[in-house]
């Protein structure tokens, strides 16, 4: 086992990365190794997808499957080894079908890629784990060095984050052939074990640029189906009655659940990154979408244990449900998996609803506590002139984009302290689950404009980027000249690709924490600092002083 893709990876003087019987996320060595094997099969599939496009062949089954299966290897998504192997077998079957299509056009069709003809050597998980050793990401570290390995992983993990957003967009009916062609090209190239530093740096920026397009179609999918989010108050306390909790990012799953629970007497609560759903008109119209439950994903083992109903996980993040003994009432959807937990293959939630009706639910309603969400792209752009006016009248000094992933490290209290230290004449724009560090606190307003503005999920960084570009255009300056600072928390691969997106767009002087990614060496961090001004957090006082004086 070697895995260094998330923030909680083991760090030692000898090197970074989980390499024992189990990773810090709870992923076993078996599952981790089989995920490496799956990725290798997906690289072979992408190699043939690139070749097929040379013949004008576009296989939509391949295009929809490849990013989805890659997504299953993202942190805290799928811990179920047999399902990982199932994805690998499906990848090979699709590859062989695509290969046959190519050979039908050109009998001499060949692909020069070491993964192009990979076969699974056994049906036994132990044997497959031994085969997977050929594809462990650091297998040639001694030959290439830590810097090349770090850049490879930056590209691989960034592309994995983009694949997750591609799957979210695909579920909503969004497809862009150029994006998929680019994805396959990069995925196939990474399967050749590239070792050129400049090429890898260029690839990381290409991934960021591609992801901007992915976020654009995801935004179109969400707003096209569910309307543009508008500011909405959400209750974060319990309402009496039977209940279901839904977590993750998949708004379509939430919509289907709301439709199927309507009139059943079962209330629905959002959790984690599903919180922004309350801002969408076509979702909040369901009166039994009664509120948001819990806090950051890392607290789920305590909070889910207390929730008196079933729980549905639509995407990341899931952690061991046996710890809180709720594994008999947590359900996984799509690419999510945990051994022994019931999985919903389709969009029928009747079994979950039946379980909710058999449980007690909340016995009474708590005193409501309302927070505001729903500052989507359209709302943000509508406020652009107001923001400019406030700046011109010196009522608004600075905007801080304070968002990203949450996690368990104690150092993450930095983000709470930073938020509460932001001066009264400054505004906080937030997104992703890092907001749970401060989104239930009161921040007041500036002439009626809330000082805490929740822009949505991690992918809604797109909205923040569009706002920044719009403000810069109206003010006749560059984005980096705005009174705007980005203070981002990271945990997994979606955050990595958001960072690459921002860097590829030329955004500079981003501050990140609580730690640097374990796969980025001091040399690579120095390059990113020199080229983009990217740096790690220090103290709230020092960072606030520096950012306000910039």
Swiss-Prot record:
The modification Cysteine persulfide is found at residue 405. One of its GO terms (biological process) is response to hydrogen peroxide. Gene3D superfamilies: 1.20.1270.20, 3.40.50.2030. Belongs to the HCP family. Its cofactor is [2Fe-2S] cluster; hybrid [4Fe-2O-2S] cluster. GO terms for molecular function: 2 iron, 2 sulfur cluster binding; hydroxylamine reductase activity; metal ion binding; peroxidase activity. It catalyses: A + NH4(+) + H2O = hydroxylamine + AH2 + H(+). Binds 1 [2Fe-2S] cluster. Binds 1 hybrid [4Fe-2O-2S] cluster. Pfam families: Prismane (PF03063). Disulfide bonds: none annotated. Its EC number is 1.7.99.1. The keyword Mitochondrion does not apply. It comes from Escherichia coli O6:K15:H31 (strain 536 / UPEC). Hybrid [4Fe-2O-2S] cluster binds at residues 249, 273, 317, 405, 433, 458, 492, 494. Signal peptide: none annotated. Its main location: cytoplasm. It is an enzyme of class 1 (oxidoreductase). [2Fe-2S] cluster binds at residues 3, 6, 18, 25. The gene is hcp. It is found in: Cytoplasm. Catalyzes the reduction of hydroxylamine to form NH(3) and H(2)O. The keyword Acetylation does not apply. GO terms for cellular component: cytoplasm. This is Hydroxylamine reductase.
């Amino acid at each position: 086992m070697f895995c260094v893709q998330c923030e909680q990876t083991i760090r030692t003087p000898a090197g970074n990365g989980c390499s024992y019987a189990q990773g810090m996320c709870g992923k076993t060595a078996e599952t981790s190794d089989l995920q490496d094997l799956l990725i290798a099969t997906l690289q072979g599939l992408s190699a043939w997808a690139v070749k097929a496009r040379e013949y004008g062949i576009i296989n939509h089954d391949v295009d929809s499957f490849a990013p989805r299966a890659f997504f299953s290897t993202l942190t805290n998504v799928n811990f179920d080894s047999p399902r990982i192997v199932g994805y690998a077998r499906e990848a090979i079957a699709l590859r062989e079908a695509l290969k046959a299509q190519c050979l039908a056009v050109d009998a001499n069709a060949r692909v020069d890629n070491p993964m192009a003809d990979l076969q699974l050597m056994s049906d036994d998980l132990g044997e497959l784990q031994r085969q997977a050793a050929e594809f462990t990401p650091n297998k040639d570290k001694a030959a290439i060095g830590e810097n090349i390995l770090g850049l490879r992983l930056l590209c691989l993990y960034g592309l994995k984050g983009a694949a997750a957003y591609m799957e979210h967009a695909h579920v909503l009916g969004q497809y862009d052939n150029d994006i998929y062609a680019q994805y396959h090209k990069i995925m196939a190239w990474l399967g050749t074990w590239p070792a050129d530093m400049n090429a890898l740096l260029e690839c990381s920026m290409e991934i960021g640029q591609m992801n901007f397009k992915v976020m654009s179609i995801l935004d179109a999918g969400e707003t096209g189906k569910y309307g543009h989010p508008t500011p909405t108050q959400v209750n974060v306390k319990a309402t009496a009655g039977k209940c279901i909790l839904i977590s993750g990012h998949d708004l379509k799953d939430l919509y289907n659940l709301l439709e199927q629970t309507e009139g059943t007497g079962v209330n629905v609560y959002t959790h984690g990154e599903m919180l922004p759903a309350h801002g969408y008109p076509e979702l909040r119209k369901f009166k039994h979408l009664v509120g948001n439950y819990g806090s950051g994903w890392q607290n789920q083992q305590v909070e889910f244990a207390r929730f008196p109903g079933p729980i549905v996980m639509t995407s990341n993040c899931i952690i061991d449900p046996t710890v809180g003994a709720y594994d008999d009432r947590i359900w996984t959807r799509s690419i999510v998996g945990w051994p022994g937990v019931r999985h919903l293959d389709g969009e029928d939630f009747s079994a979950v609803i039946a379980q909710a009706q058999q449980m007690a639910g909340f016995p009474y309603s708590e005193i409501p506590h309302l927070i505001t969400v729903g500052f989507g792209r359209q709302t943000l752009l509508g406020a652009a002139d107001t923001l400019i006016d406030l700046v011109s009248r010196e009522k608004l000094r600075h905007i801080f984009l304070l968002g990203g992933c949450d996690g368990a490290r104690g150092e993450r209290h930095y983000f709470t302290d930073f938020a509460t230290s932001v001066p009264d004449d400054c505004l906080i724009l937030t997104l992703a689950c890092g907001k749970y560090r401060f989104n239930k606190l009161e921040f007041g307003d500036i002439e009626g404009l809330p000082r805490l503005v929740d822009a949505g999920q991690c992918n809604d960084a797109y909205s923040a980027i569009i706002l920044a570009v719009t403000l810069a255009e109206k003010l006749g300056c560059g984005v980096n000249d705005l009174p705007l600072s980005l203070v981002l928390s990271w945990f997994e691969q979606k955050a990595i690709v958001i960072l690459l997106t921002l860097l590829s767009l030329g955004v500079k002087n981003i501050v990140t924490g609580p730690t640097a990614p374990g796969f980025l060496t001091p040399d690579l961090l120095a390059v990113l600092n020199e080229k983009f001004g990217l740096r790690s957090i220090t103290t709230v006082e020092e960072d606030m002083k520096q950012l306000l004086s910039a």
